[in-house]
């Protein structure tokens, strides 16, 4: 399997906010072939998707604003439809705050629902961690519960090695433990 290295557009957030389409052009000029979207208001999903196609970029995924506690089914459908227009291969929930078992179950159910919608439209679904998911809740980390309570055929994990390490985890061990469910990885430097 060939490793695909791309840029998470969060790293050029200021530029995106000023001119999303021009920033995509600059990313392509820098030699990137793969991008991971981040929500920035301004351009329509069609404009972004058309620009990505024009530049020969592949949108491997999209971090979306989706609140597992308040988003409705209709909200989820719109997110999926917008990402189809953006030619995104996957949708990512970039963190859910879970401090109780009830909250974990709510996030897991929302992930399962969004993942089923994504799959029906030819996309994958991922959960992206930060450090909060590694707090203990009823004998396990919230992250372990989330892995256990989500459908292994539908919900995958994008391991952010920085945040996993900040949360007290050994990122390589976490990736190995997730196995085929860890298909995307975020890496960035961490100071001492």
List the model feature ranges, each with a label.
Residues 1-89:
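N-terminal pre-domain/capping segments
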Residues 6, 36, 61-63, 91-92, ...:
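Conserved beta-strand positions in the central sheet of alpha/beta enzyme cores
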Residues 8-12, 38-40, 64-67, 95-98, ...:
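Active-site beta-loop-alpha junctions enriched in small/polar residues
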Residues 21-22, 73-78, 104-112, 139-144, ...:
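Charged helix-capping and loop-helix junction motifs
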Residues 41-51, 99-106, 110:
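Active-site-adjacent beta->alpha loops and helix N-cap segments on the catalytic face
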Residues 53, 84, 112-115, 119:
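Anion (oxyanion) recognition and catalysis
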Residues 86-103, 121-132:
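Active-site groove signature of glycoside hydrolases
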Residues 120-192:
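Acidic/histidine-rich catalytic cores of soluble enzymes
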């Amino acid at each position: 399997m060939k490793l695909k290295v791309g840029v998470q557009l969060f790293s050029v957030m200021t530029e995106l906010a000023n001119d999303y389409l021009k920033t995509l052009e600059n990313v392509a000029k820098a030699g990137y072939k793969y991008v991971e979207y981040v929500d920035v208001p301004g351009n329509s999903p069609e404009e972004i998707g058309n620009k990505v196609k024009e530049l020969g970029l592949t949108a491997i995924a999209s971090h979306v604003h989706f609140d597992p506690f308040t988003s409705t089914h209709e909200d989820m459908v719109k997110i999926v439809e917008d990402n189809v227009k953006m030619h995104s291969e996957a949708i990512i929930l970039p963190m859910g705050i879970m401090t109780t078992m009830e909250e974990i179950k709510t996030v897991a159910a929302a992930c399962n629902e969004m993942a089923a919608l994504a799959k029906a439209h030819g996309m994958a679904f991922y959960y992206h961690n930060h450090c909060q998911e590694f707090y203990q809740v009823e004998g396990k980390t919230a992250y372990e519960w989330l892995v256990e309570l989500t459908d292994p055929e539908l919900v995958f994990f994008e391991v952010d090695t920085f945040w996993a390490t900040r949360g007290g985890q050994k990122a390589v061990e976490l990736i190995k433990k997730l196995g085929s469910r860890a298909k995307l990885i975020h890496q960035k430097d961490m100071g001492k």
